[in-house]
Amino acid sequence: MTCTKDARLQLGREALQAAPTLLVPAVLLGGVLGLGLGLWLGCRASHLRARLQKDDRKRLLGSSEPPAQSLRDTGSQAKARRRQRETTRDEDAPEVCEPSLSGNITAFALKARVVYPINQKFRPLADGSSHPSLHENLTQAAAILPHLPHQPAEASPASSLGSLSQAGKEDGSSSSSMRSTYSDDRILQCAFLRVGSFPEILACESVDIDLCVCSLHLKDLLQVDTALRQEKHLMFIQILKACLLDFFPKKKPDDELCQKVLSKQEHDLEELEKGLQARLANTEMLGTGDSGYVSLADVERKERELSEQLIDNMGAFWKQMESIQPTLMDQFKCSSSKARQFMMTLTGRMIVAEGLLHDSQDLHVLDTLERTMGRSHLARMVEFLRTQIQEETKCRLAAISRGLELLTVQGQLSGRQKEELLTQQHKAFWEEAERFGREFTQRGKDLVQASQARQAEAAAELTQTQEEERRSFLADSQLTSDPGEFLKAFHEVLERQRLTRSDQEGDEDTRITEAMAALCQELYCSTMGTFQKFVDSLFLKTLPEVTSLPVAECETLRQQVQEQAARQLGQADRFRRRQWGLLCDLLEQDKRVWLEEGTLSTVLQRQLRDHHESTIHGVLSRFSGLSEESSRGILQGHELLLCSALRRLALRGTTITALAQMRLSGKKRLLQELHEQLALEQGVSPCLEEHQWQLLRALEARIQEEAARLEDEAQQTGLRLQQQLLAEAQEAGRLLQLHMERVIGQALLVHARNVASKGRTREKEDFKRTLVETVVESVYVTSTSVNRLVQAHYQAVGKLLQAHEEQLLQRLKTLQGERINAYKLWKKQEFSDPSLESQTADGTHGASQGVQQRMLSQQKRLLDQFTKHQQGRLNSQRQKAQELDQLQAQLETQLQEAEQTLISELSTLARVPLPENKPFSNKRGLPEKPVRTKRKKPPPREREDLGTPNDDHLALADHTTGPLSTTYSASPPIRVHSGGRLDQQDSEAGDGESTSKILQKGSNL
């Protein structure tokens, strides 16, 4: 083994020895190959670098994600690119050509310069990590301080146009800044701080101002509804009291019965309000738990449940008003007609009160909107003042970093010394900034607590004063002098009290805002003084000791650093002014949206009113039997309920608008930040390179895209929430329909009872019964004479029925002919309509943009035709019903005349005197006819040959309907025995006492 190994080694060494003659050509060839290989590698590396830069530029131009928002220095970008190129050179070719996903993200993060808001809680760094801002505690800040000197210094709030990035794909979002696509689920689950008053927003940090202010807006709307509902209850009690004094003038205001009714109504209203407040409190606490945050989904669910409960409360108040009429009939023993008149008067005055409340609600909604816009403006102003210290810190640290960098370049300061000094300055400055935020929060909370205590005390005093003012007004006013003027005066008193409370709250909001601004200014001046001490200590004490520089040179360097910081702060101040201008424009745009939604809500209310009014008029037009008074009372009650329901829906529409704005707050914030970034990029430099112009155009395109998305999202959100409003409107309409069905049913029942009891007076029924008894026992009446009278009566009734049928058929044929002629005329006018011909002519052009308009016009035309056709059918049926009623009334009059003739002839035959003749009352309004009281003497042959009524007459009598059957049901039938005596079928003549009375009457006659 050893020999073999030695042999191989010796052989190898001999092979490695070069011949002297070939040494020079080999060296030359090696040099040429090495030079060629070096040139090839250099070209390869430069080609790869250019390719990577081109790919990065394409990715920047094609990026469609939300831009991140932080400022990076130009020098730091160059350093980052150099580090990236050094890393790229160390990698082999396949890895460079196909970098991994993490490598792409890291390279992109190193090359992108992004803009972050000054109040963001976490700022991503170039390596993907994040360091907290001054909102974090001191330990977290100290943990990252050693790494701060290695981060790029931020010289100014301006940057180049390499600021489009793909940040925003992260899920992390704070309450003040959300950075991702806002899907519905994510928006609804977004949690924000639960606030009970406006000062709490000013004292809290990292608060979403838009959502918190809108939540306060919802709370103010609920307070408006509560105040107006309480005023409605107060006015109802006063109106009821005035109506009692008007309809019962003998009753005094302090009468026991009146006080009993009023106290019962007041107690019922108090119980109704207590139950509502308990349900509202349960709904307010639903799903909240002990957390100080609330989600948008919880807010929408709470508002929906509140609306349902308020609608139920409205229905309960309607039922309470209905209970007044039976109470009057029971307690005051008044007639039903007087009770109906009382309710009509009460309803009319409540309609006036509802009109006053509706106008007041519109004014309060506008006032609440102005207050909300003002609160948003004040909160943004305090936020700007509070975050100004961060800009000061960043700009001063950036200027200090440049000054130390200058000393390092000059060789007067080593790199290690520069890093140590910069670390010390970062730590000192950020600790002072943290102290500023901590002290501002603590002292701000103290101011808020003092403000809330002061406001609660002032509100209690104001409530007591206003209560005494109301009592004094009610004691001095006269209810019965002029009810309309009294309602207006009482409403003005309550309206003035509400405005006073609102002004008091607004003044307190302004006062606490001024106090917070003064506190911020005080702390700002203190912090700036501390910063100046840090700078003086660094340049006048530390640097002369470390670098052995003269104090004069250090003073000059300090002045240069301060001038650099002043220039950067000036740029930051200009940017903040533009940012504030954009914010004011956004607030004005939001206000216009609110006003437009209010206008649409007014149009919706008008449409609902027209629909319900046309419906109730159509229903009442089908009931021709109702009296004018009943119809007027029904329409009056419907108007009152409709006004109340529409007022509730109007306030709910305002709530829907607020919820829609809360849903869109995230996208509006994103668009606002894009506008701010565009303003920042445009203010960097008037001279831009080609790729910078491309990036600027890409940013503008991104803004247009986000604006289009925001508009689409606003439309979709508005449609979804409007569907909820329409569903609640349908629920309120259903409640109104049930109430009106009950009222109309009661009116129809009263009408049916009146019709059934028409003409059936007690005196007339008693006379018929007495006449039958007398005829049965009379010796003057024979079967032959009775049969003759009955036969003549049946013949007369048969003629009347035959004439009635002929008239009925004739009228129906006439009405049918009139309807056919009217339909032909309507169709002829429809086909000759010039508007239809013009639409057809326009449609022949085939313009695609007019297809939708033609379809809409065709749909509208068909709906109009259907409406006209239905109205024509309704008019025809109404005319037919009127004709039938007229013929029926005429038949009833004739049958009653025939019945009166039979009674008079029978009483004459039985020697029974008729009661005093009263003019026959025709309740259908037909012409009256005199009643015959004398009997015509039949011919002698009829006296001799009298027979029973034939079968035709009996059949005719059996088939008589309506008034005829009721007429004969009142008088029992009479039959004849073989002995010639008459008997009563009901055997009433068997009663001895009755018989004796009848005989006594006969003897007296």
UniProtKB/Swiss-Prot annotation:
Protein localization: Cell membrane; Cytoplasm, Cytoskeleton, Cilium basal body; Cell projection, Cilium; Cell projection, Cilium membrane
Biased composition (Basic and acidic residues): 939-956
Keyword Transmembrane in record: yes
GO cellular component assignments: ciliary basal body; ciliary membrane; cilium; cytoplasm; plasma membrane protein complex
Tissue expression pattern: Expressed in the developing skeleton and the orofacial region. Expression is general to all the cartilaginous components of the skeleton, including the chondrocranium, the vertebrae, the rib cage, and the axial skeleton by 15.5 dpc.
GO BP annotations, alphabetical order: cartilage development; endochondral bone growth; positive regulation of smoothened signaling pathway; smoothened signaling pathway
InterPro entries: Limbin/EVC (IPR026501)
Alphabetical keyword list: Cell membrane, Cell projection, Cilium, Cytoplasm, Cytoskeleton, Membrane, Transmembrane, Transmembrane helix
Membrane topology note: Single-pass membrane protein
Ranges per topology, Cytoplasmic: 43-1005
Transmembrane segments: 22-42
Membrane topology (Extracellular): 1-21
Start-end of Polar residues biased regions: 157-166, 835-853, 993-1005
Chain segments carrying region Disordered: 58-98, 150-180, 834-853, 914-1005
Protein purpose: Component of the EvC complex that positively regulates ciliary Hedgehog (Hh) signaling. Involved in endochondral growth and skeletal development.
Subunit structure: Component of the EvC complex composed of EFCAB7, IQCE, EVC2 and EVC; built from two subcomplexes, EVC2:EVC and EFCAB7:IQCE. Interacts with EVC2. Interacts with EFCAB7. Interacts with IQCE.
Full protein name: EvC complex member EVC
Gene responsible for this protein: Evc
